[in-house]
């Protein structure tokens, strides 16, 4: 995806403050949102579920941080412990 394509996607998804205002329907738009959100996490740091939720709540306004957390995990952008108590940015 080029920078221009990414900018076009975000025109209707993100407000001027960088807050995601809606969850997109198209797969490539969802991926762009997830890649944007993962930049809000520090690599190498471990986060509690509460911390992950707080970060996601800060960067979206449509009220479904659980969806975003699941999507980040399902798309291999974050990893977690089996008991879901700790999360971290997936590193390849």
Describe these PLM feature segments.
Residues 1-5:
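N-terminal regulatory modules of eukaryotic gene-expression and nucleic-acid-associated proteins
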Residues 74-83:
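A short, conserved structural fragment
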Residues 73-74, 89:
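Beta-rich nucleic-acid/ligand-interaction surfaces
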Residues 43-56:
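Short acidic, hydrophobic short linear motifs in intrinsically disordered regions
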Residues 84-92:
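Short, cationic-aromatic polyanion-contact patches
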Residues 7-43:
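Short alpha-helical segments that sit at the start of domains
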Residues 59-71:
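Short amphipathic alpha-helical interaction segments
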Residues 35-38, 53-57:
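Amphipathic alpha-helical segments within well-ordered protein domains
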